[in-house]
Amino acid sequence: MRVAEVVRNTSETQIRVKLDLDGTGRQKLATGVPFLDHMLDQIARHGLIDLEVEAHGDTHIDDHHTVEDVGITLGQAVAKAIGDKKGIRRYGHSYVPLDEALSRVVIDFSGRPGLEFHVPFTRARIGTFDVDLSIEFFRGFVNHAGVTLHIDNLRGINAHHQLETVFKAFGRALRAAVELDERAAGQIPSTKGSL
């Protein structure tokens, strides 16, 4: 079973992430940041990952530390659940539309952290959520999961739709990349023999 639980405690946040990469999309989310919970729900449902996230952070200041640290802890949990990466497909991509918005996400479990985030948001906030925090979430994930991640919003007018298509596409790309390939069972998906 590809499951993991990671706890991260700092002076700013206390985070717990538990996941099952081979789940059905069940989720239990309580980050204290409602829009982040909504986006994590997209990852769980579209990635078919069972996901529990509990977070307590200094949201009286703002949501930055909570959002970033949830990304970090989720990245650590995914890396732990995958383990040595034997048999995974490694690469995943997805295009997801939502009305006028369309986003593309491509991921590589390369072991080389890298983020290309190109989302021309049409406004700075979605409700009380600062859209710039989405970059911090994905940067935290990338650096701790050891992945290369390309995120492109190709079109969109509604910022909520823009970001929701990003998170849905991320969930679907993640699902494809961590899927086990029976034909490559026990093999590292690299000509180097390691990732």
Curated annotation (Swiss-Prot):
GO terms for cellular component: cytoplasm. One of its GO terms (biological process) is L-histidine biosynthetic process. Gene3D superfamilies: Imidazole glycerol phosphate dehydratase, domain 1. One of its GO terms (molecular function) is imidazoleglycerol-phosphate dehydratase activity. InterPro entries: IGPD_sf, ImidazoleglycerolP_deHydtase, ImidazoleglycerP_deHydtase_CS, Ribosomal_Su5_D2-typ_SF. Pathway: Amino-acid biosynthesis; L-histidine biosynthesis; L-histidine from 5-phospho-alpha-D-ribose 1-diphosphate: step 6/9. Its EC number is 4.2.1.19. It is an enzyme of class 4 (lyase). Keywords: Amino-acid biosynthesis, Cytoplasm, Histidine biosynthesis, Lyase. It is found in: Cytoplasm. Belongs to the imidazoleglycerol-phosphate dehydratase family. This is Imidazoleglycerol-phosphate dehydratase. It comes from Burkholderia ambifaria (strain MC40-6).
